[in-house]
């Protein structure tokens, strides 16, 4: 049986369109707020409302999937995201935009939970790493192309919202031609997010998603600031960020393949060790191109491998709840990491960005090394 079945390919096509829209809005919303002369703290509050929506959406999507299935949950998530987009053009102002971005955040989180859960339920322990790698490749490719779109088209609010909303609605179309079966509805058993977070055998996967959130959130949010403080122009900053993201895209499939072939524990250990090496290399500033490349290739691939590790430790009917727990863990890490790193950079030195990344990665590496063996026969084998 092929890893990339027709439902999987159509799901990823829809995700690409939705990710393009997410990337465009995440880039332009802060700029629109600045053009409206809103103070910096209000811009930050609007961004925070989006991530708060992510947390809320993550919590209830599992119940929704169980009640109405993957397809309808996906349609509803896309419509909620589209509503959050249209609302930006209906009412302009701090409180209204904070509300609409909160709604958009809920829709985006629902999309991620639905897509990730559908992929994990469609796969097996032998190909789940490749499925999640394909998911991350599409996600980062959409993010990358979204940045290119921003640089090529008009950035005016009322020029952007119509075609972005159209792109979101177009993202629904691929799933109209297939049906993703939710096997969770065929069992009476149910699992909660809290139960998944407490599951001892999956703890390394949960911790890995937290670490991944810290690493990626810090790199995404603070790397441009770090490069700016090194005296680089905006064009140079864009180039180096492109190197970082491109490395993450190129690393997805090989890491997923290696994880399926040699085991997730071994690959996680190597990835975390490479993140530490890349962080140390960035401190020396001797060879930034290879340092950024290996940092991106290893750091951006932590999340799917950690997810695959955790998902092979649970029953098939627990996969949706486990995915919610992992996405929640990643979101918490992506909120805490940049906040703590920014405080260290402001009060002490910019180099503490990489020292912090290396430190949390080293702690996770110790956890991985303490795990003497990997389960030879994963529980979620179907």
From Swiss-Prot:
**Places the protein is found:** Cell inner membrane
Q: How does it sit in the membrane?
A: Multi-pass membrane protein
- Cited InterPro entries: MFS (IPR011701), MFS_dom (IPR020846), MFS_trans_sf (IPR036259), MFS_YcaD (IPR023745), MFS_YcaD-like (IPR047200)
The portions of this protein that span the membrane are 8-28, 45-65, 75-95, 102-122, 131-151, 157-177, 204-224, 231-251, 270-290, 291-311, 325-345, 349-369
Q: Which GO terms describe its cellular component?
A: plasma membrane
What Gene3D superfamilies does UniProt report for this protein, alphabetically?
A: MFS general substrate transporter like domains
**Keyword Membrane in annotation:** yes
Q: Which UniProt keywords apply?
A: Cell inner membrane, Cell membrane, Membrane, Transmembrane, Transmembrane helix, Transport
Its Gene Ontology molecular function terms? transmembrane transporter activity
Where it mainly occurs, coarsely classed, is membrane
Q: Which Pfam families match?
A: MFS_1 (PF07690)
Record's PANTHER family? TRANSPORTER MFS SUPERFAMILY
The family annotation for this protein states:
Belongs to the major facilitator superfamily. YcaD (TC 2.A.1.26) family.
Q: Which HAMAP family match?
A: MFS_YcaD
Could you identify this protein by its name? Uncharacterized MFS-type transporter YcaD
- Source organism per entry reads Salmonella heidelberg (strain SL476)
